[in-house]
Regions:
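Conserved N-terminal phosphate-binding loop of PLP-dependent enzymes in the Aspartate aminotransferase
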Residues: 1-171
Length: 171
């Protein structure tokens, strides 16, 4: 893990098959995770800018979450002026049957990070970033090229997207 003392939240992952008992257990775990988040915000009121979550945790063991949990995360972000970021590096670009895994949930992120399946890495940002007057998507700086990409990768990814669309691979 990074050397920063970032708050880490227990994962309220689903277990399959989903029985009444499993559902009760995961609801209790979700409540615990939400309490951990609220405590972290209370303890660090000016230090937390975002909640970052994988819609399906890959490195954590193929962990799935309920829509209700993602909705709670979105609500916490809205109530605390935080960004809701979905890490789609392992789950994006059609791997779940939709372009993005977060599309299986009712809540939408402010920022999406992606990579691997697209053979390029990057991020998509909603207009919510415009709430910050001077941000890296708007203001030129020496670090912009870090996530700026290159022409070869962009052309390759465009061709990948065209093939997925033409072949109707997500239908």
């Amino acid at each position: 893990f990074p050397i920063f003392e970032w708050p880490r939240i227990d994962t309220p992952k689903l277990s399959f098959p989903i029985t009444d008992t499993v559902l009760e257990e995961v609801q209790a775990k979700e409540k615990h995770a939400i309490n951990q988040i609220q405590l972290a915000i209370q303890d660090h009121p000016n230090d937390i800018a975002a909640i970052i979550v994988e819609p399906i945790q890959g490195e954590g063991g193929d962990n799935h979450f309920r829509d209700e949990f993602m909705t709670s995360l979105r609500q916490i972000c809205d109530e605390n002026e935080m960004m809701f970021i979905m890490d789609e590096v392992q789950t994006g670009v059609g791997i779940t049957g939709k372009w993005w895994a977060h599309e299986h949930f009712s809540s939408r992120p402010d920022i999406i990070s992606f990579g691997k399946k697209s053979q390029v890495c990057g991020m998509l940002a909603s207009n919510r970033v415009d709430e910050v007057e001077h941000h890296v998507f708007l203001e030129s700086s020496r670090i912009n090229s870090t996530f700026g990409g290159n022409l070869t990768d962009m052309v390759r990814f465009q061709l990948i997207l065209e093939i997925i669309t033409k072949e109707k691979l997500l239908e």
